[in-house]
């Protein structure tokens, strides 16, 4: 038996039950839940009656947000092993991947921005793909876009362009925008493989 199939069998065996030996509960998983979009998303899902929200962030979520979730964890999307362990505890149907180093910080620390924005996204996409293969059911990854993926060389060009289509002017001018656009393409790649 190859080492890859051995690893997949071991992961499948450990993923079929949660960390306490209980069957995995269905869950919607949110990375970067402590940000503005994360708070809004958790609130909207909770108001919609969802009780299966599992949220992660680098910092502890506030009490109100924690009460709307079925589980909250301190976790770093760059830590692939930690993400695999967390995701294996649940039967994840959807992942809202919101964790990111945003524009200003990514400009001052481009390597950190790349590590989190690209490396963390690859971790999430690969884990979702692995779980989809193991259980024969795709895991949907929702990765919101950003205006930062677009770019114009001048204000005049921007004014002249008017309404911009989804696939026009994809010339980001910030590290964050470059990371986001690249990760959108990674998402397309993983969706097709």
Language-model segments: residues:
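Active-site Tyr-X1-5-Lys
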Residues: 155, 171-193
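N-terminal Rossmann NAD(P)H-binding glycine-rich loop of SDR-like oxidoreductase domains
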Residues: 21, 25-48
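Conserved Rossmann-fold NAD(P)-dependent oxidoreductase catalytic core, especially the SDR/UDP-sugar
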Residues: 122-175
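Conserved glycine-rich Rossmann-like NAD(P)H-binding loop of the short-chain dehydrogenase/reductase
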Residues: 49-62
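SDR active-site strand-loop-helix element
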Residues: 31, 56, 95-101, 141-147
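NAD(P)H-binding glycine-rich loop region in Rossmannoid oxidoreductase-like domains
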Residues: 70-71, 77-116
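Conserved internal alpha-helix in NAD(P)-dependent oxidoreductase domains
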Residues: 93, 111, 115-122, 139, ...
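Conserved catalytic-core motifs of eukaryotic protein kinase domains, centered on the activation segment
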Residues: 65-67, 105-112, 152-159
């Amino acid at each position: 038996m190859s080492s890859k199939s051995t690893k997949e069998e071991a992961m499948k065996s450990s993923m079929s039950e949660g960390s306490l030996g209980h069957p995995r509960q269905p869950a919607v998983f949110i990375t970067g839940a402590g940000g503005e979009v994360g708070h809004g998303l958790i609130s909207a899902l909770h108001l919609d009656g969802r009780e299966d929200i599992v949220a992660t962030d680098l910092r502890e979520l506030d009490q109100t947000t924690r009460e709307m979730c079925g589980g909250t964890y301190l976790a770093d999307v760059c830590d692939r092993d930690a993400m695999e362990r967390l995701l294996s505890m649940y039967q994840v149907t959807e992942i809202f991947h919101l964790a990111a180093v945003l524009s200003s910080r990514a400009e001052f620390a481009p390597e950190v921005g790349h590590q989190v924005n690209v490396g963390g996204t690859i971790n999430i996409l690969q884990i979702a793909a692995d779980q989809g293969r193991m259980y024969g059911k795709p895991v949907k990854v929702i990765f919101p876009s950003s205006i930062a993926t677009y770019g114009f060389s001048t204000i005049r060009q921007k004014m002249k362009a008017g309404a911009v289509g989804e696939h026009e002017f994809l010339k980001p001018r910030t590290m964050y925008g470059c990371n986001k656009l690249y990760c959108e393409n990674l998402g397309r790649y993983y969706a097709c493989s």
